[in-house]
């Protein structure tokens, strides 16, 4: 984990913030971001807990972002992690059901992979929409009590 946090810390030092046009649930939150994530799990990579309250069964995604002006705060958090200190991610999350953004030819991570791939050339700007659809996924989960029936979770 230390290697990954160290790499992120080095990259963050001079990583340029990019202007993103983003709406979540119809509200404009456009701005210059170093990082933003739409998450339904608590962590990315090796135990980087960006959304500690994210849950796969709550019917929402968690929006996490670090704006350009927040760079020093994120640097201090990563420094603390590298020093072995316990440090909670210092930015809040926002629950949402629908996100819209415009992708403008830069490479970004989508589900832990770079998009577009290195061999592909970025196309013209495209609108991307991420939406939570009720009951789109059915998860069978064993009950906490082994004597109880299994429960069905609708997402």
Functional labels for PLM-detected ranges:
Residues 1-155:
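Long C-terminal subdomains/extensions of small-metabolite kinases
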């Amino acid at each position: 984990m230390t290697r990954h946090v160290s790499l992120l810390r080095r990259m963050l030092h001079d990583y340029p913030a990019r202007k993103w046009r983003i709406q979540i649930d119809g509200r404009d939150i456009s701005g210059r971001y170093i990082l933003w994530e739409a998450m339904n799990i608590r962590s990315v990579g090796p135990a980087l807990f960006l959304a500690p309250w994210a849950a796969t069964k709550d019917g929402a995604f968690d929006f996490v972002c670090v704006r350009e002006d927040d760079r020093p705060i994120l640097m201090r958090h990563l420094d603390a992690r590298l020093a072995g200190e316990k440090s909670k991610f210092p930015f809040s999350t926002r629950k949402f059901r629908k996100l819209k953004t415009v992708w403008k030819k830069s490479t970004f991570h989508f589900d832990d992979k770079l998009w577009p791939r290195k061999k592909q050339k970025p196309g013209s700007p495209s609108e991307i929409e991420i939406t939570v659809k009720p009951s789109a996924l059915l998860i069978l989960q064993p009950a906490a009590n082994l004597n109880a029936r299994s429960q069905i979770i609708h997402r």
